[in-house]
Amino acid sequence: MKAAKYLKIQGRFAMQRGHLINPTIAFETWGTLNASADNAVLIFTGLSPSAHAASSPMDPSAGWWEDMIGHGKPLDTNCYFIICINSLGSCFGSTGPASDNPETQEPYRLDFPVLTVEDIATSASHVLDHLGIDQLHTVVGASMGGMTALAFALEQPARCNRLVSISSAARALPHAIALRSLQREIIRKDPIWQNGQYDTDGHGPITGMRLARKLGMISYRSGEEWAERFGRERAPDFTESDTPFGIDFEVESYLESHANRFTGSFDANCYLYLSRAMDLFDGLDHGGSLTASFSSLQLESAMVIGVGTDILFPIVQQQALADALAEKVSDVAFVALDSLQGHD
């Protein structure tokens, strides 16, 4: 992450269920902040991305949202100053379970406080203070990032003019919580996990992470997309083996290669904490109902985007979020995308 910047929050950083001392938040920026500092767009990521959302002169490698950020693109750097933070609790520069605890000089591991989406949103406010930004033009997020964007708008209403929520919701449904619970159990059942005490410089619970990632990827796409993309095609390197349980099909090969790539780049404990944070978030906690929770919002407009084939955050959740926002916000757009891509 050659273009990453790092903000150390000095002193005690209060969290909903604990605190950190001098945590670091990694972030990247694109474009130029104007003289009135009112053209800033803040991006919150999903569970797994880093802050490297797009290429830049400092880091020309493609980012995970390359098609969205840049000259003439939807997040136009000719007009906006774009900020993307790496979530607190992650492993791409921001303080998380894999980071050293300054009080012990050892990784936090499971001594890291319980993490909430609100904690991630609060950490972003320190980045804005550091950059001299009092009020955002827009806050944007997809999946977990959409939850974080909503939490930011609820916790920092005066700093947020516009909200864009993509494939997200005000709370996770039981089936999504159940799926993530199974992913976490798969990781924790890996003998190498060792109650979170694995060597962070070594291999870690690779088998558990690989299987959890495969399960996640299945939920990120729709059955229709799998069928259209892979059908029952055999894997390109398919050969008859002595066991009937090898990788015979192209879809199996796809899952295997992507899971292996993810496992080599993401820390297991960080995954556990961020996954749980998604489960814990509930917009109703800010008022008892969405109507009451949203009463504090000061948004000029909001856009809620959903995908009809999304399994994790069904389109009915996007509609419900848009309807609840419309009770408080005068300009709310709901966009239902007709796509086979599902959550991804």
Give a label for each model feature.
Residues M1-I43, P57:
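Catalytic-loop region of hydrolases
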Residues A322-S339:
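Catalytic histidine neighborhood in serine/cysteine hydrolases
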Residues Q105-D111, E118-T138:
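Conserved acidic catalytic loop of the alpha/beta-hydrolase fold
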Residues V304-G306:
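Short beta-strand/loop motif that positions the catalytic acidic residue
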Residues S165-R261:
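Alpha/beta-hydrolase-fold enzymes
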Residues E28, S36-N101:
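N-terminal cap/lid subdomain of alpha/beta-hydrolase-fold enzymes
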Residues Q135-A178:
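Conserved hydrolase catalytic core segment
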Residues H286-T291, S301, P314-L325:
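Short alpha-helix in the alpha/beta-hydrolase fold that links the catalytic acid
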